[in-house]
């Protein structure tokens, strides 16, 4: 199987500009870049797709360029946003870029020129505005730019001229690196398609040469929103922001319908193994979730931390690695049950996790209650004597755990 065939089989390919891309990446002849706007001091789960793609391509002999958007971050990418980003100082951007580099080195080999890390501030901040308008601005049609998908939402609430320049700046990045670093391809999220086409067209018009672009499928949460630092629900790669245990638990708790998609797209497990896992059902889906969580935690935090997180999670949720003896617990009696079962609301009140049924209901409806690692679907959920005899672990919010048994 070729590299491109594998990327397709993993569901990573969204759009490509030309079929020439296939031969380039399959034969290790691509020098490609992916851009990272450093709007926070840590990468997030939203960057996972880009990082693992860079690793896959580098393993096949292609050369990655990780472009830190020190210059474009000062403008802000309007793609998929309904408001304007907060402006960052040069000092903030420099600090964030340094943090990014440490995290990227876990995925990409920068030794001996096998990969490059560049900062577009090195060329964007020195541009002469009048020369940019004459030499670059003349290559862009305002009519076409206004039709670009990346501006749709912002047009409704007001698109600043600052943000309107983002496409030109990103296109100039590609143009500059094509000339100075032999960069002939750009990869990015599917929401970047318009910006990426701007770069290939600028190179064609200014240099008369071909450059290529491919978009990868976006990683979205259960509400269909893009995961990462701007769409909420951020899961950070920095252990000081999201601990290895919390990181593990995030992936351990993905929905049944999402687990195989995540394994296929994010891990490096062989496709043959993934195809076999795709037939798993019921309890074996929990095993698949453990595999997903372990593989991704190992990738970010190392095998030792991944093993610790897995053991701790098993102790909390399944008892497979211990009984979580230091966890607060409540012992029920048969008298606490009605017709052999007890509802989640009553259970939470008895365990001291809620002051009233009303508070318990609100927590459940908001999705803040898990039992044995699974989100409680409705306030009407009940637990039988048989379930309670084995002991269950209730999680309220992010940090409150409580064991209940009969």
Predicted features by range, described:
Residues 1-32:
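Positively charged, low-complexity intrinsically disordered leader regions
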Residues 7, 44, 117:
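Divalent metal-coordination and catalytic microenvironments
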Residues 10, 89-90, 96-217, 221:
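Divalent-metal (Mg2+/Mn2+/Ca2+)-assisted nucleotide/phosphate chemistry catalytic cores
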Residues 21-78, 186-193:
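N-terminal catalytic cores of NTP/NDP-binding nucleotidyl/phosphoryl-transfer enzymes
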Residues 50-57, 177, 195-203, 296, ...:
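Buried hydrophobic packing segments
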Residues 78-94:
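A charged helix-plus-loop insertion that forms the helical arch/lid used to bind
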Residues 81-86, 134-136, 230-231:
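Short, hinge-like loop/turn segments at secondary-structure boundaries
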Residues 203-406:
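Conserved nucleotide- and phosphate/pyrophosphate-binding catalytic cores
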């Amino acid at each position: 199987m070729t590299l491109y065939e594998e990327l397709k089989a993993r569901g990573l390919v969204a759009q490509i500009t030309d079929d020439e891309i296939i031969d380039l990446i399959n034969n290790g002849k691509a020098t490609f870049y992916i851009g990272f706007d450093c709007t926070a001091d840590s990468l997030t789960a939203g960057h996972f797709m880009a990082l693992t793609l860079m690793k896959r391509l580098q393993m096949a002999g292609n050369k990655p360029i990780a472009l830190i958007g020190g210059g474009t971050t000062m403008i802000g990418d309007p793609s998929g946003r309904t408001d304007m980003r907060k402006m960052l100082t040069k000092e903030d951007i420099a600090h964030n870029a340094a943090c990014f580099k440490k995290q990227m080195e876990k995925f990409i080999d920068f030794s001996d020129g096998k990969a490059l890390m560049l900062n577009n501030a090195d060329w964007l901040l020195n541009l002469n505005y009048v020369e940019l308008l004459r030499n670059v601005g003349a290559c862009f049609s305002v009519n076409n730019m206004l039709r670009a998908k990346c501006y749709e939402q912002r047009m409704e609430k007001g698109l600043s001229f600052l943000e309107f320049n983002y496409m030109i700046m990103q296109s100039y990045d590609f143009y500059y690196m094509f000339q100075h670093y032999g960069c002939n391809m750009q990869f990015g999220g599917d929401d970047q398609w318009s910006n990426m086409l701007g770069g290939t067209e600028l190179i064609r018009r200014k240099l008369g040469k071909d450059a290529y672009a491919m978009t990868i499928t976006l990683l979205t949460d259960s509400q269909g929103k893009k995961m990462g630092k701007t769409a909420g629900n951020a899961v950070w790669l920095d252990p000081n922001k999201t601990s290895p245990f919390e990181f593990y638990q995030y992936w351990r708790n993905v929905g049944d319908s999402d687990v195989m998609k995540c394994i296929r797209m994010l891990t490096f497990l062989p496709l043959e193994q993934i195809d076999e896992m795709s037939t798993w059902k019921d309890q074996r889906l929990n095993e698949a979730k453990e595999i997903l969580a372990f593989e991704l935690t190992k990738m970010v935090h190392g095998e030792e931390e991944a093993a610790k997180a897995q053991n701790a999670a098993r102790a909390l949720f399944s008892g497979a690695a211990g009984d979580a003896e230091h966890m607060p617990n409540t012992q029920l009696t048969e008298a606490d049950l009605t017709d052999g079962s007890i509802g989640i609301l009553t259970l939470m009140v008895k365990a001291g996790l809620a002051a009233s049924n009303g508070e318990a209901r609100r927590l459940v409806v908001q999705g803040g209650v898990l039992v044995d690692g699974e989100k409680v679907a409705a306030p009407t959920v009940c637990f039988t004597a048989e379930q309670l005899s084995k002991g269950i672990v209730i999680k309220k919010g992010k940090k409150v755990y409580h064991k209940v048994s009969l």
